[in-house]
Amino acid sequence: VDTVLFDLPAKEGPADGVVIKAIANLTKLSPAPLASKSYAEAITPANYETGLEHLRDCDLIIEAIAERMDWKQDLYKKIAPFVNDTAVLASNTSGLGINKLADVLPEQLRHRFCGVHFFNPPRYMHLAELIPASTTDAAVLEGLETFVVTHLGKGVVYAKDTPNFIGNRIGV
């Protein structure tokens, strides 16, 4: 799956330096986060200052920054103008309120927003939770479930928008 990986711009060197280093590290970690080192070639580095135009070509945008509501909401405000009219935006939060995250999104994007929580380490953990917001379109969830099951090989459970969803509440 072709992927664009975002991070903050580097303070020194190339603007995408933080991501370039992260991609290089993916091929060195154990256990390996990628099934094949060659998969790193499908990852395009980008940063939040100069790379937001990349989002216009994305079908699925998964936000996975630190678990702070204010940071996530600030990021959504920043990227929303670059999300195309058919793209799905999902948060990989492990327990923040999906409806509260959706509150800052433009109305035309809210029906394409939900939570998708991959458990760590994602390559080795089979389960993913899908958490709809009250505004999420059912067809968006069905399409995301199909992608997660068929392309990523995950089992999917639907969770309600409650603190920590299902897995973290029961300690998975």
Regions found by a protein language model. Give the residues of each.
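Short beta-strand element of Class I
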Residues: 2-4
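Rossmann-like NAD(P)-binding element
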Residues: 6-21, 25-89, 95-100, 107, ...
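Rossmann-fold dinucleotide-binding core
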Residues: 85-169
